[in-house]
Amino acid sequence: MKNDREKLGVENYLKKPAVSNSRLSVQTLPTFDISFDRITLVGDLIPKCEKQVSDFVSIDSSISVLEALSSKFKAQNVLDNIYIEYDKFKGKSLQRKNMRIEFNPNNLDQNSMNWIKNNFVKFMRDIEFSRIDLAFDTEMDLGNFFILSDKSVKKTIFYGRDDKPETKYFGTRQSDRYIRIYNKKQEIKDNKDLEIASENLWRIEFVLKRNMTEKWSVCFDDLNIIKPDWKMVEKFSERAAIYLLLNEDGEWGNMNRKTKYKYKNILKEISPIDLKNNMQEELERQQERLKKELQFWLT
């Protein structure tokens, strides 16, 4: 089951850039498989249930106990890679929920989901999500796509052995929203030594924490996910600036607000496709299913 589910009125001087006579070609819009790739549940263990849950952790054959002390344990279900942590006193001292459960829903069948709910979740109160990873998988090559935001977003790119982009990070791990675009096919090959049949498999993943977990259905409304072709800009100085901005992210910091706005508009103009609209439409189609999946853990 695990492998099956693993196999998505600013100033007028800001004119549109002059592009080459060859028009933007019509692009085939990709399709997306959407899933929650990681969920972290937090809540407070009901005090009278502490012994029952601790005893279960100590005797269940599928659980590897990593640490066990009075009113505290860390454990892992070795079959489905489910992590469970409870710390009564740490939760109290830090004024936060004392129990945490982490898992990848894509790796769980219904029996595993029921195992989590019946043995842990039902003994917790004030349950909420502290992290949700929303994944969009597509067979389109996303190596040359970029995230464009009105706000300043840190970008980090890692290249594969063929010197092509393999993983792109937008934002920081500490932020409430952290975005990854990566070659899922290569990741599967590297980590599982499996070669999938599709020519390409890429993932756009939104790591949402804290308050952003409640906004998962609109978590990229403020972004553009584009594939700019810098060669289309005819004016040499603008073409050179666009190339520099695409390859040296720190150069955005050397521009004033108006200039940033100008070049962000140019990037949008020279991109034949913005994946955001397509992703929003697909998310709307699958939204009820995804809502039910989250609601399962809260009821």
Which positions does each model-derived feature cover?
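Residue-level detection of the helix-turn-helix DNA-binding "recognition helix"
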Residues: 265-269
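Structured, helix-rich domain cores that form ligand/interaction pockets
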Residues: 1-255, 270-299
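Helix-turn-helix DNA-binding segment
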Residues: 257-264
